[in-house]
Curated annotation (Swiss-Prot):
Organism, as annotated: Acinetobacter baumannii (strain ATCC 17978 / DSM 105126 / CIP 53.77 / LMG 1025 / NCDC KC755 / 5377)
Lineage: Bacteria, Pseudomonadati, Pseudomonadota, Gammaproteobacteria, Moraxellales
EC number: 3.1.-.-
Residues annotated as binding Zn(2+): H119, H123, H129
HAMAP family, per the entry: Endoribonucl_YbeY
Protein name as annotated: Endoribonuclease YbeY
Length: 158
């Protein structure tokens, strides 16, 4: 499996160093865990509070910034055979929210970012925790298993 990663860092912080190789490892671990084997493309944009707030309001009608937004690609079926790699979609991750949540939850910023990346990739693959309690449990279970493979503790344990 080949992963093409587009990383746009509109907001950076010395508290959270993002390395492409590590991001690809997290994405690949997530994809393999759920049985995905195709070459793919994923975009990640790291943004500030203002941009996250604006996008969350525009696309989810929530008037506040959020940690991660997922935008699955909507490629017509007839186009797929012409592509070398399947565009899975884009993730927008708000670095200030990640840092604040990590502090509040007593986690490292790196581990919290990894959790949100796993969470976002699962959304790009069609998983949704907002449709039912069962779906939420399934998604959380997958996140816990994937993060364990990355040597990251269960993010839902206090």
């Amino acid at each position: 499996m080949k992963i093409s990663l587009s990383l746009q860092q509109d907001f950076q912080s010395p508290e959270l160093e993002l390395k492409r190789a590590q991001l690809k490892k997290i994405i690949e671990t997530t994809l393999r865990h759920v049985g995905y084997k195709e070459d793919c493309e994923i975009g990640i944009a790291c943004v500030d509070l203002e941009e996250s707030h604006q996008l969350n309001l525009q696309y989810r009608e929530k008037d506040k910034p959020t940690n991660v937004l997922s935008f699955p690609s909507d490629i017509p079926e007839e186009v797929l055979p012409m592509l070398d790699a399947l565009p899975l979609g884009d993730l927008v991750i708000c670095i200030p929210v990640v840092l604040q949540e990590a502090l509040e939850q007593k986690k490292t910023a790196q581990n919290h970012f990894a959790h949100l990346l796993v969470h976002g990739v699962l959304h790009l693959l069609g998983y949704d925790h907002e449709t039912s309690d069962e779906d939420a449990e399934e998604m959380e279970g997958l996140e816990i298993e994937i993060l364990a493979k990355l040597n990251i503790a269960n993010p839902y344990q206090e």
